[in-house]
Amino acid sequence: MLMQHTLTQLKALKLDGMARAFEEQSTLTASTSLSFEERVGMLVDRELAWRDTRRLERLLRAAKLKNPQACVEDIEYRQTRGLDQRIVATLAGCDWVRNAQNLILTGPTGAGKTWLACAFGQQACRQGFSVFYVRVARLFEELKIAHGDGSFTRRLAQLAKIDVLILDDWGLQDLDQAARNDLLEVLDDRVGTRSTVITSQLPLEHWHAWLQDPTLADAILDRLVHQAHKLPVKGDSMRKKTKSESADA
């Protein structure tokens, strides 16, 4: 009776991890040999682990990663990809996020840029940072709608609070003047305070021409490329490789 009352109180306090551990202890005879301090310590440890797990789940749901299973441990380092394992390991530490620096992934279509961006995004979530993935074209569609319904300022504020904003397929489609202005607004709110990840088939040296407006291009690239980590990805299409391996299996 007392045990059930304690469980009910723990759940009422939203100490779900501790409640589960307490219930487990009551069914294990080995727990009786532990001291009071040891048992309490185990309960607290379980609660902390439970909260960490729930927080990670919330962050990953909010991130909306295109490849939610991508993780840095599964990155392939074939020589043809040109990835430096030491650089990747450094990026996996997420100091670039803590220092509000950006990450630019460039390479041919299918080379795995989006997957890598999602892997770094998941790693950032693991370390407690908020992440959001969006394709560039989709972002500007949403911002155009936000202008129309009066939610643009609120949406900008939301984007400004995200620790790691992943902009996928940069340079794939031309931007109109309104989109270029919106892009500057988004990046200006983030410079020096938050990190932005870019994936692009377009080589970095072509970005200025893609943005068309020289003045805006200078302002946008200054905010984005300054102190950015650049990770070029080489090699054949990873999508074709995966299909080929599936066919051979």
From Swiss-Prot:
MF terms in GO: ATP binding; ATP hydrolysis activity
Top-level taxonomic group: Bacteria
The entry's keywords: ATP-binding, Nucleotide-binding, Plasmid, Transposable element
Residue sites binding ATP per the record: L105, T106, G107, P108, T109, G110, A111, G112
One Pfam family this sequence matches: IstB_IS21
Record InterPro entries: AAA+_ATPase (IPR003593), DNAC/IstB-like (IPR028350), IstB (IPR047661), IstB_ATP-bd (IPR002611), P-loop_NTPase (IPR027417)
One GO process term, biological-process aspect: DNA replication
Family named by the database record: Belongs to the IS21/IS1162 putative ATP-binding protein family.
Annotated protein name in UniProt: Insertion sequence IS408 putative ATP-binding protein
Organism: Burkholderia multivorans (strain ATCC 17616 / 249)
UniProt lineage: Bacteria, Pseudomonadati, Pseudomonadota, Betaproteobacteria, Burkholderiales
